[in-house]
Amino acid sequence: MGRFAGVFFNRKVRKGFRKGRGDVARLSIVPPRTTLTLIAQLMSWNSIIGQQRVKNILQHAISENKIAHGYCFWGMEGVGKDALALEFAKVVNCLEPRVTSSGIESCDNCRSCHQSDKLEHPNIKFVFSLPAGKSTDSRDDSPIFRLSDDQIKLIQEQMHIKSENPYHNITIPNASQIRISSIRDVKKSVTMSASQSGRRVVIISEADEMTTEAANAFLKTLEEPHDQVTLILTTARHDTLPQTILSRCQQIYCEPLSDEDIAENLVLKMGVERSEARLISSFAQGSYAKACEFLDEDMRAMRLDVIEILRSALKKSYYRADMLFKIEKLTGEKDRTRVEMMLMLLMIWLRDCYAYSLAGNNAMIINIDQQETIEKFSGAFTGADYPAAIQSVEEAISHVRRNVQLQLTLLTMLITCRRIFLREV
């Protein structure tokens, strides 16, 4: 399955390890297949969501043969930094690249492209945090020698998912640091003769997770550029990286994605219904990876539950018992993340009601499948101070994040909304 942190994978079944060229280990385990909801597509610049400015910069650098020795792709999590780095690596190694009106593309058909798509290309090295593993006496051992068979299997599975979905955030238990052994392995690999023509590209994913020792070792590698080698850092926290490293890289900002781009890709790639995709994208805050995480949540059921609580609070009479019962039911598991999501759903729903009260059928609303309900609610509370109600929900979200007692937070918000909509003194 390609290479990670200095490890080469091949497709033949053997037992154990054997030494490959130099001191780099070859791991011979057939990667397991993982069932994905993702509709697999060939990687290309067009498969990367948004980021047109960054694509133009990279394509121009390739076309004009002005590729930097080091890059730092930075921006919030889930906006495609790894996807951009992997596609760049694929294009510069393509055997038959195509020049188009928009720039330069990989052919998607040659052996090199197929290797890149599977993260199996010998010229592409993808480095990320690994567990510490067992200690060894040798400082030259590849970090893979420290890991158990179960850890190696999990890493293979995560790399397979990454090859199918470059927006996937690799998650390995007890892996929070990129250690010096991984960077030593990088240095070793870029100094060896390449086994295949093309440009060697090393991608350090979430580079801010490098230890101080690892960062110092990486700096030395940056200071000794090699022909046909490019080092790419990706990070959501570039301000935590040493300035000595950043100053030697071309820094490229990857901006948050638009709700429209996220929703469109949820529909096309994940098969999500358009109305649900719009709802999820409004939560994602510009991150496609975060949007994908929300796919496991029953957003519509949560939305219905929180709207029902609001309706209970707005009953003319005998509302307290029903409202308190529903609050207790909602907060029974003390799941703050779920409560926060439900409050965000309520906030978006109230914003839609406010927009509808101002523009009627011309309003641009997120909860398009709730238009009839929104119309009825807006009609029942004409002239209501929606901004004040929305602010009360925002304050409740803030209290949830600050660990204020959940039942008290929801009760205060609902009583405030009742006073606003029923105009109680």
PLM feature segments, named:
Residues 188, 220, 243, 247:
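Conserved adenine-binding aromatic site and its adjacent loop/helix in ATP-hydrolyzing domains
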Residues 191, 217-227:
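Conserved catalytic/switch belt of AAA+ P-loop NTPases
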Residues 196-201, 226-232:
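Loop/turn-to-beta-strand initiation segments
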